[in-house]
Amino acid sequence: PDESMDPEAAYRFIHDELMLDGSSRLNLATFVTTWMDPEAEKLMAETFDKNMIDKDEYPATAAIEARCVSMVADLFHAEGLRDHDPTSATGVSTIGSSEAVMLGGLALKWRWRQRVGSWKGRMPNLVMGSNVQVVWEKFCRYFDVEPRYLPMERGRYVITPEQVLAAVDENTIGVVAILGTTYTGELEPIAEICAALDKLAAGGGVDVPVHVDAASGGFVVPFLHPDLVWDFRLPRVVSINVSGHKYGLTYPGVGFVVWRGPEHLPEDLVFRVNYLGGDMPTFTLNFSRPGNQVVGQYYNFLRLGRDGYTKVMQALSHTARWLGDQLREVDHCEVISDGSAIPVVSFRLAGDRGYTEFDVSHELRTFGWQVPAYTMPDNATDVAVLRIVVREGLSADLARALHDDAVTALAALDKVKPGGHFDAQHFAH
């Protein structure tokens, strides 16, 4: 516009348009946090103007970031951590898991270069399931790495150790294993994959590291399943990424990537910048970004502690498992994941109902619920599923309302049998 307007009018204009987005609390498609304590919101509002990169100018914010990284590294059992020394952890905060994945992948590629010596003329590859988040495809394309996708099949939506062993070779920079897939919420068999790679290396085969994509499960599994070994307790795991704005319970966007130790982050990737009077080591793709997301994450760490996170995850898991049990009793539904691994329930229609999962998703929208329907990855694209992500804010009362609305929607579709008017859609992360 050429002319200015009254601030209240500008606010109202934008506020009214945003009402068309609908309620984020009823958006069961997203893993992203949609509710925080008012005190956290106040802290974040007070610090949104602080630039995370200006560490000399905002030393308290920089110290908070280092403490967050150290706590994440400790949660995942990283090596060489020293009490009262947050800088002993090797890792960084990021704008989200997408940036964290890029940084973890770059470290794998540089370590592969160091391992093979003369790497020019060789094409590095990365082994992962076809169920990975799209950022892994972006990483391979942007940084010239061959993606080796391991296919799914009907009834199995995670990768297997046998698939991994058949795919790795001397040009493999690493294997990606997922702690909580975005398609179904299932946990991949990380310990079994590492054991298979250990046996391969011990027999004179290639020595391939593992990166764990814990974007969805990294802040769930340590509290719900503390005895499950998937992290740096496995010597083959060299790096882990996690999203703070998912089950870290913080508004977007914040994530972390941590390494088992400093030797797994090549020094060539760390820039030392003389910026605003300070020598600042940095390993990020972004430069300027607000510090308030890290402050919000720090608030959650202090406010909840291990005990609080455990109680929150147990409550979410209870709600998810209740939903899974209720859906299992509906003869229309075949439950794929019941919410016991992480608080995600995925299900599909049982048999030929005369309509599709996409019709169910559309019908639920008439009640205000956003429940995504999508087809599974290669080679299971003939399978369509619906997914419910249980987050803070989805109370037991809302879960009961969702169940009742789902039963009503299925009954309505039984009467009209639209025959699948809505086209199949592939997964959108």
What positions do the PLM features span?
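Active-site C-terminal subdomain of aminotransferase-like
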Residues: 206, 223-226, 230-343, 348-352
